């Protein structure tokens, strides 16, 4: 995913957190903030230290990014959102991560209306 699609700055993360607009399932928490004048969505990925060791956290982040790349054309473009992995996400296969992440994104209404 291109750098322009990522949220990297701490201040941007905090701005999205402070909206308190979140949904969750058992594996992921999604925070979102509408940005009407934005050309495309931006995403921040957070995998805390409770989620395994550094190798496992990197593995989970890569799987989340890959899933987002696969569903990118279907996502709303005028939003910033954060994906926070819960501890149980470390034990999932790629297929399970995709299923759970798509479920969380659906709960957050981040897919374009058909």
From Swiss-Prot:
Coiled-coil boundaries: none
GO-annotated cellular components: ribonuclease P complex
Keywords: Endonuclease, Hydrolase, Nuclease, RNA-binding, tRNA processing
One function term, GO molecular function aspect: 3'-tRNA processing endoribonuclease activity
EC class of the enzyme, as a word: hydrolase
Pfam families: Ribonuclease_P
EC annotation from Swiss-Prot or TrEMBL: 3.1.26.5
Domain of life: Bacteria
Gene3D superfamilies: 3.30.230.10
Reaction(s) catalysed by this chain's protein: Endonucleolytic cleavage of RNA, removing 5'-extranucleotides from tRNA precursor
A GO biological-process term: tRNA 5'-leader removal
Role according to the record: RNaseP catalyzes the removal of the 5'-leader sequence from pre-tRNA to produce the mature 5'-terminus. It can also cleave other RNA substrates such as 4.5S RNA. The protein component plays an auxiliary but essential role in vivo by binding to the 5'-leader sequence and broadening the substrate specificity of the ribozyme.
Assembly and interaction partners: Consists of a catalytic RNA component (M1 or rnpB) and a protein subunit.
Family: Belongs to the RnpA family.
Classification via HAMAP family: RNase_P (MF_00227)
Protein name in UniProt: Ribonuclease P protein component
Gene: rnpA
